[in-house]
Regions:
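Conserved glycosyltransferase catalytic-site signature
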Residues: 7, 80, 99-100
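Active-site-proximal, substrate-binding regions of enzyme catalytic domains
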Residues: 46-74
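Acidic catalytic patch
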Residues: 41-45, 67, 71-92
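Acidic, PIN/NYN-like endoribonuclease modules and their adjacent C-terminal/linker elements
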Residues: 103, 108-149
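Short, well-structured N-terminal submotif of metal-dependent ribonuclease cores
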Residues: 1-39, 54-61, 137-143, 147-149
Length: 149
């Protein structure tokens, strides 16, 4: 099962927020099979902004960080088709355009899940279901995607 990740999951894994959330995000990412994870390019851009603006990281360090994530997982870019579908999604569901780009990228990449704390948990668009990876109760789809053992 292919799984897309949103900015907040990577930001938490980088230590933005709290040590407890960092450990939780890192543990979750380690349990996802590497070849199943998709990072929309939009997420890397947002992560750069979060690191430089919110976390006070230098531009050079933030660039190195996003390159590390790009090396670790498959990165999918924003095509004109993805952007147009995102605009339709944003207009029809009143979702922020940049969140819609991430969801549209996940759909075009064949992902079944988008792990996000920002979008509505359980929202399904096409074949992609948004799952809050930090929800108290583990979503069955996320559980199925995780490595066990």
């Amino acid at each position: 099962m292919r799984v897309a990740v949103d900015t907040n999951l990577l930001a938490y894994a980088e230590g933005v927020n709290s040590a407890a959330r960092r450990a939780e995000a890192q543990a979750l990412l380690l349990r996802l099979p590497d070849r199943s994870v998709v990072v929309p390019a939009q997420v890397l851009g947002e992560l750069f902004r979060v690191l430089t603006r919110k976390a006070g990281v230098s531009g050079e360090s933030a660039r190195a960080t996003i390159m590390s994530w790009a090396d670790a997982f498959e990165v999918e870019g924003t095509t004109p088709e993805v952007l147009l579908r995102a605009a339709d999604l944003a207009a029809s569901h009143r979702i922020d355009i940049w969140d819609a780009v991430i969801l549209s990228t996940a759909a075009s990449s064949g992902c079944r899940l988008l792990l996000s704390e920002d979008l509505q948990d359980g929202f399904t668009w096409g074949s992609v279901t948004v799952v809050n990876p930090f929800a108290v109760q583990l979503n069955p789809l996320l559980d199925a995607a995780l490595k066990h053992g």
